[in-house]
Amino acid sequence: MRCRELLNGFEWECTRGNAEREIKEVVYDSRKIKPGCMFICICGYKVDGHQFAGEAAEKGAAALVVQKDVELPPESDITVIRVEDSRYAMAFISAAYFGHPADRLKVIGITGTKGKTTSTYLIKSILEKAGYKVGLVGTIETIIGDRHIPADNTTPESFMLQQYFREMEEEGCDIVVMEVASQGLKLHRTQGFTFEIGIFTNLEPDHIGPDEHADFEEYLACKGLLFRQCWLGIVNRDDAHTDAVTKGHTCQLETFGLDKRADIYADHIELVNKPGELGIRFQVRERGIGNIPFEVEVPAPGRFSVYNALAAIAVCRHFKVENSQIQKALLGASVRGRIEMVPVSDQFTLLIDYAHNAMSLKSLLTTLREYNPTRLVSLFGCGGNRSKLRRFEMGEVSGNYADFTVITSDNPRYEEPEDIIEDIKSGIKKTNGKHVAICDRKEAIAYAIDQARPGDIIIIAGKGHEDYQEIKGVKYPMDDRVLIAEILKERAEQG
């Protein structure tokens, strides 16, 4: 492929060499530079790819894509393409390099503070029940046919995303459903194609910091970029930020929510509380004459489960899907580490969730309180080498909203777990919350199970889908589900 053929969709200038050069491969990782490749110099948070420009020339790269001046050997015949933003350019270059696979797929993108992961799996579940072949890209994993690829980022770099699209097309996928993080939008990872449908779930202050968004206004603005890059936007009418997020949109808009003015809304909401299980049941109604309501049940608790299901239903209305297929798919849906119920006993309920900050823990505990448990038991730790404020806040939230807290270890990283636990205790001591600290996570879970009372709800929070514990730079195998299974087996053997 000639260099020029990769340079469509953005402005560029050839400042050295010849844009007609043949390109054998496209790379953005300096460790993968090969003779004849195009090396895209990306400004990362820790490493600037421009510092490897000279090395690329020496290794025989055919072309560089840069956004600032670079030093090159004077004898090198390398081609240099100057652009305003090399990340933006990389998205278009990657799409061209892989043959624009998204043009032959219907790509559905979901953005929002909460609900992205669950909504992607619900959409995938419904569409597959209706006979479609669906790829998925998200926080937990990328799914291509039978392959499950663990995720590094919620939204992969544009090159990897386009590679996934190509592989999904080759696998025979019709549709791709993906989480679209605000950071991914900010860094242009989803440029180079147009989404068939964009969904907005909700917005709350989060991901504000030196490595993410400067302030809430930037966070909001980045979410809104999705609605200038899709044909149809489906948004939560009930969220206070919806108008701001969709300001300047270039797509048609539809709404979902509990508000009866939404295009699709929930009515007659009922909590489902069965032995060892929690869920929610509601009627789905659509505005317009002749639309007959139908009932769905979701095996996940809380109002946010209604919103996640409504978003999925609203999307699937644009495909050939029967109501009965929606009902069956939702009833059987489960998302790993997202209010995931683990069958342990019909006397109490045990859930695993990824809630790892004060906001998500408060939302979860408030939701579970609606089910009137005998006790609401919260078990969690906090990650090391992260904000200490998060520890104080999570301790205070658990002390205020749970009846009993079991403080334990999460991913201590390079800190001592006992020090992290002390920080959490500082937060909980601001409340009258009863608590115990057990550093070993398996022992902590065993304690919570052994002390459970009939009607209790126990939430094991923080790690969710993770299957490791990070200590001193090493990730050791650890999965809350496996720990629970081991504990139950040990109890059974003890008689």
Features from the language model and the residues they span:
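ATP-dependent carboxylate-amine ligase
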Residues: 1-14, 35-38, 250, 289, ...
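Alpha-helical segments flanking ligand/cofactor-binding loops in enzyme cores
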Residues: 31, 54, 125, 166, ...
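Acidic, Mg2+-coordinating active-site environments of NTP-dependent enzymes
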Residues: 3, 10, 70-76, 171, ...
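Structural beta-sheet core signal
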Residues: 136, 178, 198, 235, ...
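N-terminal leader/targeting and accessory segments in enzymes
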Residues: 1-92, 228, 240, 262-270, ...
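Phosphate-binding loop of NTP-binding sites
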Residues: 10, 90-233, 237, 241-249, ...
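Short glycine-rich anion-binding loops that position phosphate/pyrophosphate groups of nucleotides
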Residues: 44-46, 182-183, 204-207, 239-240, ...
